[in-house]
């Protein structure tokens, strides 16, 4: 029975399209297997697993049981693996959810041969098909599908759509990733989701019910064994167990009975169903046969239809050909126009021929002209004869002229000789004049050099001032122009806008014209090509004509030459005779006639040749035309060839696109099936319409906004420019008031930050622009692709038709071009491929037609449901029409937008240029503000003016600018006037000095005469009575002589100093020249840098302006986006409202659902009741049925009996026969009954077996449920772990990113540090090189110092010899002095001295006034530091002390020192590069002022030296003494040396004598000086070594300032420097000696001094004892201070002092201090007080004091001065000491003779090595001092024995050792 039912199902299933598709993967059964074998192979799952492997080869290989042998469990296992793999593939790779119920593996495994089984297998195959179609190898599988029959293909396509597009079966998860989905797309998705949810809930409920039932059954089964076990247990009572078991058995019996009843009913129903099915089957078979016949008919119809289709295609091709032929006809018609053009061209050529004929006529005319010329030749011959006569006359005149020229040449030679003689004489005279001038210039040289220098300085200063004035005027003019331009810009912008509008209209017109002109251009180009060819041909013809004409010209020239020859021969013959002439003429005439004939024949030949050439020309033209035609054809062919190639490429592209189209077609088919999606798309269209309308409106609004923005921007740019100017002014003023110098750094940082921010904005803007451009491009690409696809779909057929026509053309062209044949063959192949593809497309179209028909049926059904939607579709169609119109409008708007954008670009460029101008204005304004600050604008007023309006501010600024400019000009004019006044004063002063020198020389000569006279008097015998008088007179005369000598010495010193100054100025000139050259080079480099920086600045400014403009555009875009966002927010709010309403509906539905559940429960209860009633009714029905059957049987029996009785009545025989028949029937019925009984037994057995299998299945389900629960728990755990791991992974990812960021930061820092390290290393190397050079210089200076000391010793010996000679002379002169003493008047030199001092006071007073004015102007300018001053003081010379005048060795050392130090100064020049230009200007000012300061200092020195002689007369003249003290103090104050010793000249020389001469004892020195030492107890040896005079620190300016302040302090405290007022005084300072860096070490100096003289040792011991004593008494609680602390304190002091003072202020302060000190000295005449000061951290002398670690030394305060008082008796000198004084004076005279040597008065090394860079240089000095290993000498008090040399030497050695050990320890610490 089952086989009979299943076989037709199986046959249907195996012929189904899904199975046929699966068979494409391979044979199902080996060999010729039956359908059953193939079905079994399918159901077993092995084959299907293999198919899945082919689809997804990446699958994990799971064990598949290949030998199933009809085992249900193995089958289920295989199929479950398959189902799992399919589910995994859909979810993971395809991102799809299987919504349809998965194929039931149980049914397939246990009941494969049933309808349910086949349906489940169908599901499996469907899912497999979905996998195959969407996998990576889908192309192969689709090709296999295409290889199938048409019907199967169509069915498979339908199945594919079921799987892929029907969301009820498979749900796509990719929409989850899409963020921007419209509402219309979301709505159908939500509906589907709701349906799916409902279905899932229903399934869940069903499954839960089944689970409950199964669990109850399981509990029932478990209950029996449990009961039996409880029965066995002895605990329970037996009575209870029996009752329970009985109840349980009764329940089970009832259940069993109910089941039996159900089974019986089912059996009966099934039998009835079977009968019904048989009947239906028969009907179905009939219908099948009918359908098969119909199918056959349809197939025959389809074949005929295909035939008709082929014919249709042929007709279509013919139609296409007709179209193409028509197009060709149109082309030929177009060519007709070309023919007309060619006709016109022929006419033109004819005209050209006419022109050529005209040229021919012209040539003939020319020939006639030549004939006329030949006639004229005779006339010309006559004229020639006349000209020859004239020539003869001219030659005569020429000869006369030659003679005259020769005469003139002779005269010229004589004059030249005379000139040479006069030149020689003049040269000789010039040479003599030069010699004379040289002699005169030797005396006037210094004056000229000074005058020149001052003139140059003034002229350079004037030039610079003029340049500055010009630049300022230019800036003012520029500002005014910019203001005017800014005012005019507004009107310009309005005009520009109008012009822009007008231009935009013009542009539109021009664009149309351009299109027309392009077309005309193309025509012109074609014409030009033709014309070019014709031109080339014509040029060839013209060349040939030229050649012919040249030949003719040559022939004519030859004829002319021949004629000329004949003319010449005629002339010759004219000399002979007339008869011969006539004959010759006749002959020549004949020759001429012949030549004319020849020429005429030649001309005729030429004409003939011309005609031939013309013919040839015409022939060639015809050929040219043909060639042109051929070329045109070639061009056409080439174009066609190119077109064909393009078409081929297009076809290839289309082939590629066809595949994409197929996919799109499949998608379109799916869309066709679903009308909802079409409606959604219509909704989208409406949405797009609305969006486009909005966009159009937005574009219009944006255009309007842009125009408004442009206008507002223009206004804003004006306002912004003004506001920016004001803001920048305000900010600069505030920051300058707050910070000053720090503003520059801050502004630099700000600019850098702004640049960075601008760069960031740049990058962001670029990125945004790129994104916008990309999005626009993508949109355009998508639109173009859509249009292309539509166009390609339309043009595919046209292309095919064109290809066919082109193929025919190619066949025609094959003969001419072999290359084209290959291309045609390729095209034919392509054509075949295309035809195949066409066929395939047709088939697909047929499939589509079938699908469309199905869709139409569905659409018909849907249309009934959705009539309202159809109305909406109509509305949407109208909107589509609107859309098209809007698109057109949009295109127009886009065009307008492009024009607007162009205008915007131009406006942006204008904006950029305007912004650049404003920025330039800002820069100029900033410069002006800086200059205003320098000039001294009152900033408080400006701050008050901030509150006023913009106009008033602007006016105020203009007025202030003008006033400040005027002020600056006035100040500059005053400065120039002051400089000129100084010049005049200096020149007058020089003249006065020279006059004084002359008078001194005269006095000196007079004195010499007097001495000679005295000698004469001494030779006569002296009178004994007048001895005392003579002695007194001699004393007076000696005094006067000494005064005169001192005066002479001073004059000579002045002379020497002037010479030294001259040399120093020369060296300074050279240095300045070199510096100037270097500075010029630096300026050029800086100018280049500034130019490059300006260019960069301009580029940056342009970029900045562009960015600002772009930023404004982006802002406008952002505003539009914000508007859109607002609209979206409104939409969102509406959606939220809708959502709320939906939620409410949902809640209502929930409540309904709850009520329904309750109703359902009630119904279930009713159902149970009805079930029980139904069972009872069934039982009743059964009994009634059995009774009915019995009654029927009885009824039949009765009928039979009745019939029998009737028949018995009729025919007894018939009854007998009937009985026999009945007996046979009874037998058959018995047999049937037996068979029925047997069948009943079988059914019982089957029932038992089924019950058994059912119980087994229940057990298996229980096991599976437990497994399922376990798996569920495992799954939950794994999910939890997965979430945890994902969280950890995200954390780790974040950490990794942070680490990445930190690593990049660290890398950047490392790179920066490495760069810094490299820079520091380079700087260190540079510093090391500088240190090395300085060390080398130091060594050279030490060597020079040693040499100078040796020279000093030699000179000392010479001076001693001279002293002895002078003593002898003095003894001789004493006698003469006695005689002439009465007539000697000593007052004039004093008066001269006073006159000089008065002049000095006037000069200083005038300078004070000038300096005060300068202070006012300079204090307002902010000084960076005094480094520039320090640098400019390089050539500044130290004034020499009075104590070191005669020592030549010192000056020798100094000259060498100046050379080296000048080199150092030049090396240190590069640090000037980094300074601004204003500082350079300031430097120039300082340099000029310094040169004048040097002059003043030299004058001051002269005054000091005059003071030494005139103070011998202490009680006589007080005023002169005061003045000289002032000048002496000034000499000390101008020096940069802090420790400068103030010994008298005589005292110093006496010391030198004592030190160097061994014969003199300690008694030779004045005892008064010793007593002074003992009384004060504070005398120190203060003589300098050779190089100590040059000991100066790096910060000379600060020292000068400090010294000035301290001089003031000293004056207030009634303390002054001790001067050498008397010959017997030794005023020694308390300070130590200062050891300079260029000089020898103090230890070497001490050693030398101690070795040379024991007296000096004695003095040292005494001074040290006195000092030690004083320190102990004075400061018992003093501290030891480190050098670094001391330096830091000093730097703090000096930095404060430097800011308030300039170089010119020094003189004012010096003069004030001098005036105070002079007053004080005038009051305290008898007692001379010495002030010894030590400035903190200024000199190495101070370091000498402070480095010692002994506690006895004082810690000097940073602002206090160390003052020690030296009191000396001012009494008259004793007779014992007078001799010594005389000796000293004589020695000074002898030494003075050697002051004229060149080394004597050179500037010191320290004067040149006055370094620059105040604050920065201090630190470098500090570093140098800390690195210096040399320690100062800590001098201990020596033992009592003063004469011992050994103790001093040992002390010095110990100090040397201690210093070495300390230096080593320091080096170790530093390392």
UniProtKB/Swiss-Prot annotation:
- Stretch list, region Phosphoinositide-binding: 1390-1408
User: Which parts of the sequence carry Phosphothreonine?
Assistant: 1421, 1673
Cross-referenced Pfam families, in alphabetical order? HOOK_N
- Give every Calponin-homology (CH) domain span: 12-132
Phosphotyrosine is carried by which residues? 1765, 1799
Post-translational modification here is noted as: Phosphorylation is induced by epidermal growth factor (EGF) in a phosphoinositide 3-kinase (PI3K)-dependent manner. Phosphorylation by AKT1/PKB is necessary for delocalization from the cell membrane and for cell migration. Phosphorylated on tyrosine residues which promotes binding to phosphatidylinositol 3-kinase (PI3K) regulatory subunit PIK3R1/p85a and enhances PI3K activity. Tyrosine-phosphorylated by both receptor and non-receptor tyrosine kinases in vitro. Tyrosine phosphorylation is required for AKT1-dependent phosphorylation of Ser-1417.
Q: Where Phosphoserine occurs along the chain?
A: 233, 237, 449, 1020, 1387, 1417, 1675, 1690, 1717, 1820, 1837
Question: What membrane topology does the UniProt entry give?
Answer: Peripheral membrane protein
Specify residue ranges for compositional bias: Basic and acidic residues: 1026-1035, 1407-1416, 1743-1763, 1820-1830, 1854-1871
Q: Where is this region: Disordered?
A: 816-842, 1010-1035, 1407-1459, 1559-1601, 1736-1871
Q: Which residue intervals are annotated with compositional bias (Polar residues) in the record?
A: 1417-1430, 1445-1459, 1559-1578, 1787-1799, 1807-1818
Q: Name one GO cellular component term.
A: centrosome
Q: What is this protein called?
A: Girdin
Q: Which organism is it from?
A: Homo sapiens (Human)
């Amino acid at each position: 029975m089952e086989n009979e039912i299943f076989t037709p199902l199986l046959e249907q299933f195996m012929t189904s399209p899904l199975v046929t598709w699966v068979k494409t993967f391979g044979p199902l059964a080996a060999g010729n297997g039956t359908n059953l074998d193939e079905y079994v192979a399918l159901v077993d799952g092995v084959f299907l697993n293999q198919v899945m492997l082919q689809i997804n080869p990446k699958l994990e290989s799971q064990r598949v049981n290949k030998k199933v042998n009809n085992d249900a469990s193995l089958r289920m296992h295989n199929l479950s693996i398959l189902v799992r793999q399919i589910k995994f593939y859909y979810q993971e790779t395809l991102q799809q959810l299987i919504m349809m119920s998965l194929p039931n593996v149980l049914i397939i495994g246990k009941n494969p041969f049933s309808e349910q089984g086949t349906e489940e297998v169908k599901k499996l195959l469907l899912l497999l098909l979905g996998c195959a179609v969407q996998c990576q190898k889908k192309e192969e599988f689709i090709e296999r599908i295409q290889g199938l029959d048409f019907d199967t293909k169509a069915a498979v396509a339908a199945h594919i759509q079921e799987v892929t597009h029907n969301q009820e079966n498979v749900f796509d998860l990719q929409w989850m990733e899409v963020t921007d989905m419209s509402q219309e797309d979301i709505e159908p998705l939500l509906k589907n989701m709701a349906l799916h949810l409902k279905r899932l809930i229903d399934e869940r409920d069903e499954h839960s019910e089944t689970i409950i039932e199964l669990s109850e059954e399981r509990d029932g089964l478990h209950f029996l064994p449990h009961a039996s076990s409880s029965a066995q247990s002895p605990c329970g009572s037996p009575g209870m167990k029996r009752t329970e078991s009985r109840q349980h058995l009764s329940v089970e019996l009832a259940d069993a009975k109910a089941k039996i009843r159900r089974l019986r009913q089912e059996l009966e129903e099934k039998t009835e169903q079977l009968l019904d099915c048989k009947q239906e089957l028969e009907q179905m078979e009939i219908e099948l046969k009918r359908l098969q016949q119909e199918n056959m008919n349809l197939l025959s119809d389809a074949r005929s239809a295909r035939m008709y289709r082929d014919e249709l295609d042929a007709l279509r091709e013919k139609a296409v050909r007709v179209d193409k032929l028509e197009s060709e006809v149109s082309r030929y018609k177009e060519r007709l126009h070309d023919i007309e053009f060619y006709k016109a061209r022929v006419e033109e050529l004819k005209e050209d021929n006419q022109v050529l004929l005209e040229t021919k006529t012209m040539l003939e005319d020319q020939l006639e002209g030549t004939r006329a010329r030949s006639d004229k030749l005779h006339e010309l011959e006559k004229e020639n004869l006349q000209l020859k006569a004239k020539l003869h006359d001219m030659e005569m005149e020429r000869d006369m002229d030659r003679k005259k020229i020769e005469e003139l040449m002779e005269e010229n030679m004589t004059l030249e000789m005379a000139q040479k003689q006069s030149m020689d004489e003049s040269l000789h005279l010039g040479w003599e004049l030069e010699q004379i001038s040289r002699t005169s210039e030797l005396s006037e040289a210094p004056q000229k050099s000074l005058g020149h220098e001052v003139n140059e300085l003034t002229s350079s200063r004037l030039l610079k001032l003029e340049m500055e004035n010009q630049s300022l005027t230019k800036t003012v003019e520029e500002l005014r122009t910019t203001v005017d331009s800014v005012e005019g810009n507004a009107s310009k912008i309005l005009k520009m806008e109008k012009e822009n509008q007008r231009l935009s209209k013009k542009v539109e017109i021009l664009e149309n014209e351009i299109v027309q002109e392009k077309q005309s251009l193309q025509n012109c180009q074609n014409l030009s090509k033709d014309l070019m060819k014709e031109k080339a041909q014509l040029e060839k013809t013209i060349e040939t004509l030229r050649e012919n004409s040249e030949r003719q010209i040559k022939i004519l020239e030859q004829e002319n030459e021949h004629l000329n020859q004949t003319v010449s021969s005629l002339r010759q013959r004219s000399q002979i005779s007339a008869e011969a002439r006539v004959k010759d003429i006749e002959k020549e005439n004949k020759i001429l006639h012949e030549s004319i004939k020849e020429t005429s024949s030649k001309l005729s030949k030429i004409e003939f040749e011309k005609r031939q050439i013309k013919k040839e020309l015409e022939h060639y033209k015809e050929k040219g035309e043909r060639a042109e035609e051929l070329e045109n054809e070639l061009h056409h062919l080439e174009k066609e060839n190119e077109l064909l190639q393009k078409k081929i490429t297009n076809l290839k592209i289309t082939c590629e696109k066809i595949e994409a189209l197929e996919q799109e077609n499949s998608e379109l088919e799916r869309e066709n099936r679903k009308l909802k999606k079409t409606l959604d798309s219509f909704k989208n269209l409406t949405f797009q319409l609305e969006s486009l309308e909005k966009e159009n409106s937005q574009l219009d609004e944006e255009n309007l906004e842009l125009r408004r923005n442009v206008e507002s921007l223009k206004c804003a740019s004006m306002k912004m420019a003004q506001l920016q100017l004001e803001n920048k002014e305000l900010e600069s003023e505030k920051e300058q008031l707050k910070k000053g110098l720090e503003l520059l750094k801050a502004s630099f940082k700000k600019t850098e930050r702004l640049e960075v921010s601008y760069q960031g904005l740049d990058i962001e803007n670029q990125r945004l622009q790129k994104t916008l451009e990309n999005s626009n491009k993508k949109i355009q690409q998508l639109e173009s692709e859509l249009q292309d696809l539509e166009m390609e779909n339309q043009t595919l057929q046209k292309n095919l038709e064109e290809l066919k026509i082109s193929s025919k053309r190619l066949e025609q062209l094959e003969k001419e071009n072999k290359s084209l044949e290959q291309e045609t063959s390729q095209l034919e192949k392509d054509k075949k491929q295309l035809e195949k593809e066409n066929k395939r497309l047709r088939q697909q179209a047929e499939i589509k037609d079938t699908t469309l028909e199905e869709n139409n049926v569905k659409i018909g059904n849907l249309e009934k449901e959705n009539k309202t939607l159809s109305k909406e579709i109509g509305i949407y169609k109208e909107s589509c029409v609107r859309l098209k119109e809007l698109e057109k409008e949009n295109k127009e708007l886009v065009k307008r937008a492009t024009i607007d954008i162009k205008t915007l670009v131009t406006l942006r460029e204008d904006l950029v240029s305007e912004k650049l101008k404003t920025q330039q204005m800002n820069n100029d304004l900033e410069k002006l503000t800086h200059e205003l600050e320098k000039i001294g604008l009152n900033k408080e007023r400006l701050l008050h003016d901030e509150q006023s309006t913009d106009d008033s501010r602007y006016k105020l600024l203009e007025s202030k600018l003008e006033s400040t400019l005027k002020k600056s000009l006035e100040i500059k004019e005053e400065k120039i006037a002051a400089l000129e006044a100084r010049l005049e004063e200096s020149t007058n002063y020089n003249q006065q000095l020279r006059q004084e020198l002359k008078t001194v020389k005269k006095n000196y000569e007079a004195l010499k005469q007097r001495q000679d006279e005295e000698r004469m008097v001494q030779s006569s015998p002296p009178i004994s009575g007048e001895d005392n008088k003579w002695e007194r007179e001699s004393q007076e005369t000696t005094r006067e002589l000494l005064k005169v000598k001192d005066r002479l010495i001073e004059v000579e010193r002045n002379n020497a100093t002037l010479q030294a100054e001259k040399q120093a100025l020369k060296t300074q000139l050279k240095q300045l020249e070199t510096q100037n050259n270097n500075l010029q080079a630096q300026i050029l480099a800086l100018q280049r840098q500034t130019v490059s920086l300006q260019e960069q600045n301009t580029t940056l400014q342009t970029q900045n302006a562009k960015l600002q403009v772009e930023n404004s555009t982006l802002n406008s875009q952002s505003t539009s986006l914000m508007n859109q966002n607002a609209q979206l927010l409104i939409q969102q709010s509406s959606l939220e409202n809708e959502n709320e309403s939906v939620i409410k509906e949902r809640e209502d539905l929930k409540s309904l659902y709850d009520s329904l559940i309750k109703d359902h429960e009630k119904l279930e209860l009713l159902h149970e009741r009805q079930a029980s009633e139904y069972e009872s009714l069934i039982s009743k029905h059964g009994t009634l049925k059995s009774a009915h059957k019995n009654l029927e049987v009885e009824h039949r029996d009765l009928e039979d009996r009745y019939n029998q009785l009737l028949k018995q009545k009729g025919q007894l025989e018939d009854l007998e026969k009937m009985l026999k028949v009945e007996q046979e029937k009874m037998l058959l019925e018995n047999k049937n009954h037996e068979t029925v009984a047997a069948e009943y037994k079988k059914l019982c057995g089957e029932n038992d077996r089924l019950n058994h299998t059912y119980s087994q299945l229940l057990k298996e389900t229980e096991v599976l449920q437990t497994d399922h629960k376990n798996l569920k728990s495992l799954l939950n755990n794994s999910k939890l772990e997965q979430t945890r791991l994902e969280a950890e992974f995200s954390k780790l990812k974040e950490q990794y990113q942070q680490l990445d960021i930190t690593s990049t930061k660290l890398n950047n820092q490392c790179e920066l540090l490495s760069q810094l390290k490299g820079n520091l290393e380079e700087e260190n190397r540079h510093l090391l090189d500088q240190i090395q050079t300085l060390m080398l210089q130091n060594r050279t200076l030490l060597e020079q110092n040693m040499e100078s000391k040796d020279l000093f010793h030699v000179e000392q010996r010479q001076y001693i010899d001279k002293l002895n000679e002078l003593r002898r002379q003095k003894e001789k002169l004493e006698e003469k002095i006695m005689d002439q003493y009465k007539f000697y008047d000593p007052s004039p030199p004093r008066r001269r001295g006073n006159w000089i001092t008065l002049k000095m006071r006037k000069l200083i007073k005038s300078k004070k006034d000038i300096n005060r004015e300068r202070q006012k102007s300079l204090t307002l300018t902010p000084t960076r530091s005094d480094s520039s001053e320090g640098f400019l003081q390089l050539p500044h010379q130290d004034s020499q002390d009075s104590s070191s005048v005669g020592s030549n060795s010192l000056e020798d050392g100094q000259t060498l020192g100046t050379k080296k130090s000048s080199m150092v100064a030049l090396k240190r020049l590069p640090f000037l590069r980094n300074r601004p230009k204003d500082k350079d200007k300031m430097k120039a000012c300082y340099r000029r002022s310094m040169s004048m300061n040097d002059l003043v200092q030299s004058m001051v020195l002269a005054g000091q030296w005059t003071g030494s002689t005139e103070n011998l007369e202490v009680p006589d003249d007080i005023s002169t003494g005061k003045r000289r003290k002032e000048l002496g103090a000034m000499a000390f104050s101008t020096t940069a040396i802090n420790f400068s010793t103030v010994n008298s000249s005589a005292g110093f020389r006496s010391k030198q004598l004592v030190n160097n001469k061994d014969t003199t004892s300690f008694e030779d020195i004045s005892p008064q000086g010793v007593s002074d030492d003992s009384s004060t107890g504070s005398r120190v040896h203060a003589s300098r070594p050779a190089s100590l005079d040059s000991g100066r620190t790096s910060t000379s300016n600060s020292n000068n300032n400090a010294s000035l302040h301290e001089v003031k302090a000293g004056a207030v405290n009634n303390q002054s420097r001790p001067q050498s007022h008397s010959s017997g005084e030794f005023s020694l300072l308390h300070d130590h000696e200062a050891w300079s860096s260029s000089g020898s070490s103090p230890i070497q100096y001490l050693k030398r001094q101690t070795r040379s003289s024991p007296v000096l040792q004695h003095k040292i011991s005494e001074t040290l004892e006195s000092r030690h004593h004083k320190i102990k008494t004075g400061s018992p609680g003093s501290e030891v201070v480190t050098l670094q602390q001391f330096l830091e304190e000093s730097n703090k002091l000096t930095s404060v002092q430097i800011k308030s003072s300039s170089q010119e202020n020094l003189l004012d302060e010096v003069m004030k201090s001098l005036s105070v000190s002079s007053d004080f000295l005038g009051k305290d005449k008898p007692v001379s007080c010495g002030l010894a000061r030590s400035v903190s951290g200024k000199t190495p002398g101070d370091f000498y004091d402070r480095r010692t670690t002994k506690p006895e030394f004082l810690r000097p305060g940073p602002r206090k001065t160390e003052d020690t008082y030296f009191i000396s008796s001012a009494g008259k000198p004793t007779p014992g000491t007078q001799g010594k004084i005389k000796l000293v004076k004589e020695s000074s005279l002898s030494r003075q003779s050697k002051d004229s040597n060149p080394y004597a008065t050179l500037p010191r090394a320290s004067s040149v090595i006055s370094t620059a860079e105040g604050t920065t240089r201090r630190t470098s000095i500090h570093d140098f001092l800390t690195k210096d290993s040399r320690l100062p000498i800590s001098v201990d008090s020596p033992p009592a024995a003063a004469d011992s040399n050994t103790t001093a030497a040992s002390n010095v050695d110990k100090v040397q050792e201690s210093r070495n050990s300390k230096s080593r320890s320091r080096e170790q610490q530093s390392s």
